[in-house]
Amino acid sequence: MDRDSIKNKYDSIIENINSLKDKYNINYNIDIVAVSKYSSMETIKEFLSLNINLPLGESKAQSLRDRAEELNKNYNNIIWHFIGRIQSNKVKYIVRYADLIQSVDSIEIAECINKEAIKNNKVQDILLQFNISNEEQKGGFNLSDYNMVYDKIKNLSNVNIKGFMGISLKVDNDFEIEKEFESLNEVFIKLKDENTSILSMGMTNDYHLAIKHGANMIRIGSGFLGYS
């Protein structure tokens, strides 16, 4: 994808977000993660050359490692988010390169991240992923366990809970999707503070619903950097 196409898509997303903010009287920023997991290196480089300064989202540990090692040499201040399922044997790559891990879906994984962060002498920012769609194949904590999970993980020395993440059902049913987003927003409202301030919900096809229900971070892939 060329620079002009990327810029046009970015401008369209910003216009949509601003319209939604006006519609719902939202006065806080809504951050965009440019999901690059399906994009070619050429497309990512075109994006970076625009200096738009959005985080890049990767879902596979080796891809994060390889892309970060190559791109960080030539581009300054790239922010990397990890948004995929986490395998304990790949945590070392994720902690080494990710600025924010959005998909922490078990206490065991949080503990692995904490150990690796200690080795790397860093405090790792994370989001807790909740399974708002109740799908077995998706990762995430049960919403009913939010207090126990939050209290246990926040006491780990080298992880920093920045907020929460959820993925909705892929269904043609706005009412169901909105219920899922609102269920996580309710937990976020109870636990948010100056540090725990991110609610990451919504992708290309449903971010308009996520913003309606409190999302302040959205993850856009096919509608932005696309497939290449």
Indicate residue ranges for each PLM-predicted region.
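Active-site-proximal glycine-rich helix-loop-beta segment
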Residues: G214, G221
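Mg2+-dependent phosphoryl-transfer enzymes with acidic/Ser/Thr/Gly-rich catalytic loops
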Residues: Y227-S228
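Conserved alpha/beta-domain cores
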Residues: M1-N205, I211-H213
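Paired acidic/hydrophobic, glycine-rich loop segments that form the ligand-binding mouth/hinge
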Residues: I101, I218-R219
